[in-house]
């Protein structure tokens, strides 16, 4: 019977057992250290891995892996790179593409060779032959590969781990010989004496990509004077005409060329000085009656540097200075002025360039034009040799500069010495300076196919677009590529040299034969077998005339041949590949070496699209280094550090979420504060999924499924929003804009679900009768949301997605989320008119919630259900949406009162008295008042009419009916 609104004793009885409470095994805490490996074991047992993509029936999609170097622990750069690739591959797999991802490793080169040598005792090193070194290097590389592979797997990376490509494999080495051979036969590879970047610390030539340029390099720069010994008659006549008071003989006997250099050790190799024909030069006299030649535009700077008062006697064009002769600074011979190019400027120095053709590229080029000697004064260790005269035995990185400077000072040739800060190339492995040194090397002549390479760059899509300009400018300006190295751990250049003479033996028969041998036996036979066994049978008789070459190929030629050794050879892949994805430094590395070899052999690029990412920095934007103590270790992110409070175990999915959250086109920060924020986002997504799963524990889609038009408006909107979010996330994945995925996911889980739909749904889910339509329709929607949410997040949060899927309480057709395929929805789920109305009503809801929160902050109320809302509209759009809701909405679900989670809502023409708060805003007046009636002890709504419940409790009519029907 109806109760009277009289004060009665409060009951301690709880209706909790009568509510449909959340029930799921999907835990609030991820416990990733345990749960993620369990999920990976589930994948392994059920072949839920890269094979899913391989078995798809769609178009082949090939993301070709740029091989990391097989040395050292994994770092954040690896994480950024590999997770980006995995996100793309998983998305393409879900889209039905045939995806077969083949991870690779770069295995040859100096770092591994040095590691092997460092691990040996000195006597072992002395007795180590090349074959044993190569065996130890192979073993070391395999250990490193296995360590890195286990790390990649723990990150949730899918790939053909049983068949990766390794540059040390026989099949790879054979294919690489094939690339070299075709380039040689096409006329693009030659042997010549040329200055190359040489590392005295590594004792080998280096490619441009093996250099780095530290910011704090200082060179000992010097200005020196060179005594002029012969001047052209034209200049002499001009001088006499303009300087009547100075005798011709005085000008001839007291004139000096001024030059500036940052490499004093190259002075013994001087063969000329070069001028720019377009620059104006002057002869200027000082107070000591010495006449100096230098660029006119540098007059003031030189006068200040030398602390001399210089008076200009004669101005000449650079072109007039050709063939003026001068006394070599350290040798008993005359040299001359030659005409150089635009590399000679007036930005620094004197405008006259010391030219040593054996120790500089520009010097070499001008030397070729004038047939100058290519004098190399340095040996492989950086020691000055016999061609340096009295400086023999000194070292370019140690004492040579000081000895030569002292010599110049003693002979009154040194004008000034100063330290000069500039960019200077260092060996990227030993971190020591390099030099230019002319040696006999093997080169790829880029000039032969430069125009084709530039056209290939135009044909490729570069992301970001700035990458195209960057690699284009590099290829336009690059010289020939030095591909030979003087080391043992690499693929040999398959050439034979005549023992007596300069002839070489290298042709199609040799190349094909070596390629076949390497395919069967591997490259070690180059050092193991004698010449007779390496040569084709027709050359066996003359084998005694030949010796094997000892050079190996540049490791960039190794990795740059991967399109031939992997994409071309494996039927499950395609060439050109759809995508190359690496750090932005690879424009000068792997992107370029792959492009050059592919164009030289097949006249096409090896890729259709190139995507680049930046570098991982600390939270303050600094480069990570052990010395700064700011290195973020991906292993610690996943498993935690020694102190779990300061370094908690976040798991692989938080690492993956970081990758999706950043604008990877630029350098990206990572650190403890960022990880905390990401972990918070991860928890919100996880808790949203848990709420969805927990509230469909008794739902059966085979019984309670509905057409869209059977559902309440709120449910129709939610499904329409799911379609919109799916479209947005699909576009983000398609365009590789993963940070948009991150933003959309956050907004969907927090704003659309937690703060709106699921907040409103609590009453429907908990309080309704189990099988009531208002509850089942909500469960239907939630089942659609949770299933598709799992798929949408699976490329990024792969472990959480699978965990969600395994906790769906009803039977699904697919065993794994990755077998589901990408969501496809009926277009009828989209409803623009409905969206507009609900957007208007959500705006009103936000304003009303602010007013209610104001009451709560004043401690006038606790829950929103303790209030009623009166709304006096001033916004016609919102008013129309309220009328629409009243006309078309479900009385069980779409009452705006229930959307607000208040006990009553009315549109009024006048406000009443006794307000808790009145808020005026653009939408109208919002009045919050105390809820009338009594609180229902089950649903907590306030009703004017209540009924007696169990043990002196009060129930609203709805709850009273449910209790009477289901629990009595």
From Swiss-Prot:
ATP binds at residue 626. A motif ('HIGH' region) lies at residues 68-78. Transmembrane segments: none annotated. This is Isoleucine--tRNA ligase. Gene3D superfamilies: 1.10.730.20, HUPs, Valyl/Leucyl/Isoleucyl-tRNA synthetase, editing domain. It comes from Prochlorococcus marinus (strain AS9601). IleRS has two distinct active sites: one for aminoacylation and one for editing. The misactivated valine is translocated from the active site to the editing site, which sterically excludes the correctly activated isoleucine. The single editing site contains two valyl binding pockets, one specific for each substrate (Val-AMP or Val-tRNA(Ile)). Its cofactor is Zn(2+). Keywords: Aminoacyl-tRNA synthetase, ATP-binding, Cytoplasm, Ligase, Metal-binding, Nucleotide-binding, Protein biosynthesis, Zinc. Monomer. Catalyzes the attachment of isoleucine to tRNA(Ile). As IleRS can inadvertently accommodate and process structurally similar amino acids such as valine, to avoid such errors it has two additional distinct tRNA(Ile)-dependent editing activities. One activity is designated as 'pretransfer' editing and involves the hydrolysis of activated Val-AMP. The other activity is designated 'posttransfer' editing and involves deacylation of mischarged Val-tRNA(Ile). A motif ('KMSKS' region) lies at residues 623-627. Binds 1 zinc ion per subunit. InterPro entries: aa-tRNA-synth_I_CS (IPR001412), aa-tRNA-synth_Ia (IPR002300), Anticodon_Ile_BEm (IPR033708), Ile-tRNA-ligase (IPR002301), Ile-tRNA-ligase_type1 (IPR023585), Ile-tRNA_ligase (IPR050081), M/V/L/I-tRNA-synth_anticd-bd (IPR013155), Rossmann-like_a/b/a_fold (IPR014729). Belongs to the class-I aminoacyl-tRNA synthetase family. IleS type 1 subfamily.
